[in-house]
């Protein structure tokens, strides 16, 4: 089957990019590709048999028209000016059989006009982390970009140490960012901001294109998508680590995996980015930061959208967030209905977990085994303060009895939303260290495991992290 690529971005937004081709690596070789995703995108298996090829930027497929996008943004709350694709190149937009499209974006593809002081490269460590994280999030049911392939090489890349240059093929319906809008707003070119909005609506919100107040309706949906995404992050214990406005997806996708981390111990103020000295992007601050970022996006639209309409959309954020979060947390607790004591029970559990540094993922997974008519709980042994746990658990069992559902039905529901497996940093690090020595076995094994996060396991993928794996420091270096 011949793949079809179109050039909407290149044709319709000529002032938002620089056309250029990838710069290949030395002795590049394909070490992993996503068979399931490739099948979904109807990519012939033969494309994965010619070593690096398109996956390493050595050649292009017919119809591809590569370009690097320009955007700007606020980083750690401060205006950073022009940024852009400093090491990534959009190779093309694949047209799928159902009429939708998928960007092919090659990360680590070499210098671009937006590289600033960088070298345009990515390292094996960061490409492995992003591939694992994006696929983990996908199988958790959370909107995200996807990883299609990883290429490593003999090209040295200089970070804190000398590392192997690598490339990641990332795919997504769109790479539209809040930062695209900010770029032209701060250049005082509101007509180009409007062109971006029209492009987004025309291709991704086409049902709104003929509406008289299409910009208000569109921005309201952007707010809702963002709120829903953040709610889902919070329920699985995911910390993004670098929620700059240029890393915010207009479509509500998890974008740009850098110093991310899933909670091990339940620590509300968890900071996964060792460069985040003030804790701006801490786990519990993510909902507030997302709203702040939406406010920055709203500002860019103010030249052609009524401020009252923008504020009305922003005001809806909190309720959408709380609705999605509340629904998912009730499912995680096994509640079939909404009762007034639910929030208090959840907050008391969180207080217990925070005091005892309980493992976030294991706690909710073990809670899924609760039998409402039994005073015993496998979770009890996880707590030092047994009396406090017993008090909470008695009230929790009482709450369960308010819903007309069998234990087996409730347990099945809870196990479908409480994963046994998340991508803990130590698991990723183990795969990275093996890969850096030339052994890709653990990389492939972990990718396969992450496809079934809600299945019971009895291996170390679902155990507490070893001492060396706790609080691994991760930076933005990639």
Curated annotation (Swiss-Prot):
Catalytic residue positions: 246 (proton acceptor)
EC number of this enzyme: 2.7.7.-, 2.7.7.108
Catalytic activity: L-seryl-[protein] + ATP = 3-O-(5'-adenylyl)-L-seryl-[protein] + diphosphate; L-threonyl-[protein] + ATP = 3-O-(5'-adenylyl)-L-threonyl-[protein] + diphosphate; L-tyrosyl-[protein] + ATP = O-(5'-adenylyl)-L-tyrosyl-[protein] + diphosphate; L-histidyl-[protein] + UTP = N(tele)-(5'-uridylyl)-L-histidyl-[protein] + diphosphate
Keyword Nucleotidyltransferase set for record: yes
Single GO MF descriptor: magnesium ion binding
Co-factor(s): Mg(2+); Mn(2+)
Residues at which ATP binds: 84, 86-87, 107, 119-120, 170, 177, 256
Keywords: ATP-binding, Magnesium, Manganese, Metal-binding, Nucleotide-binding, Nucleotidyltransferase, Transferase
Annotated binding of Mg(2+), by residue: 247, 256
Family classification: Belongs to the SELO family.
Function: Nucleotidyltransferase involved in the post-translational modification of proteins. It can catalyze the addition of adenosine monophosphate (AMP) or uridine monophosphate (UMP) to a protein, resulting in modifications known as AMPylation and UMPylation.
Protein name: Protein nucleotidyltransferase YdiU
Originating species: Escherichia coli O6:K15:H31 (strain 536 / UPEC)
């Amino acid at each position: 089957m011949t793949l079809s690529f179109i050039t909407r971005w290149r044709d319709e937004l000529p002032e938002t990019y620089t056309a250029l081709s990838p710069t290949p690596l030395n002795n590049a070789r394909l070490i992993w590709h996503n068979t399931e995703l490739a099948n979904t995108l109807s990519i012939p298996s033969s494309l994965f048999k010619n070593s690096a090829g398109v996956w390493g930027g050595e050649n292009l497929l017919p119809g591809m028209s590569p370009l690097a996008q320009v955007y700007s943004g606020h980083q750690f709350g401060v205006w950073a000016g022009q940024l852009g694709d400093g090491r990534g190149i959009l190779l093309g937009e694949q047209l799928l059989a159902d009429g939708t499209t998928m960007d092919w974006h090659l990360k680590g593809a070499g210098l671009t006009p937006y590289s600033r002081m960088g070298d345009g490269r990515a390292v094996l460590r960061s490409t492995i982390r992003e591939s694992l994280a994006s696929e983990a999030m996908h199988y958790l049911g959370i909107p995200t970009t996807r990883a299609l392939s990883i290429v490593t090489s003999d090209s040295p890349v200089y970070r804190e140490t000398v590392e192997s240059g690598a490339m990641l093929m990332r795919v997504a319906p769109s790479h539209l960012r809040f930062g695209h809008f900010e770029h032209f707003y701060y250049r005082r070119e509101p007509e180009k901001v409007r062109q971006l909005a029209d492009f987004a609506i025309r291709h991704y919100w086409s049902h709104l294109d003929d509406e008289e107040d299409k910009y208000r309706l569109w921005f309201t949906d952007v707010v809702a998508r963002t709120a829903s995404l953040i709610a889902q992050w919070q329920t699985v214990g995911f910390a993004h680590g670098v929620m700059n406005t240029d890393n915010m997806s207009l479509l509500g996708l998890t974008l740009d995996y850098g110093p991310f981390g899933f909670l091990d111990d339940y620590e509300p103020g968890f900071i996964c980015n060792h460069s985040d000295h003030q804790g701006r992007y801490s786990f519990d601050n993510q909902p507030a930061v997302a709203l702040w970022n939406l406010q920055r996006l709203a500002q860019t639209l103010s030249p052609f959208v009524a401020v009252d309409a923008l504020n009305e959309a922003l005001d809806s954020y909190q309720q959408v967030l709380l609705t999605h979060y509340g629904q998912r947390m009730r499912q995680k607790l096994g509640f079939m209905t909404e009762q007034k004591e639910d929030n208090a029970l959840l907050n008391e559990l969180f207080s217990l977990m925070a005091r005892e540094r309980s493992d976030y993922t294991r706690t909710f997974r073990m809670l899924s085994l609760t039998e409402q008519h039994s005073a015993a709980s496998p979770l009890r042994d996880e707590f030092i303060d047994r009396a406090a746990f017993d008090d909470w658990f008695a009230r929790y069992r009482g709450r369960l009895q308010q819903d007309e559902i069998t234990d087996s039905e409730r347990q099945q529901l809870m196990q479908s939303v409480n994963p046994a497996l998340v991508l803990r940093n130590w698991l990723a690090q183990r795969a990275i260290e093996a890969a850096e020595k030339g052994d890709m076995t653990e990389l492939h094994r972990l990718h396969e495991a992450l496809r079934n996060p809600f299945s019971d396991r009895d291996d170390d993928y679902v155990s507490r992290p070893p001492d060396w794996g706790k609080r691994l420091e991760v930076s933005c270096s990639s």
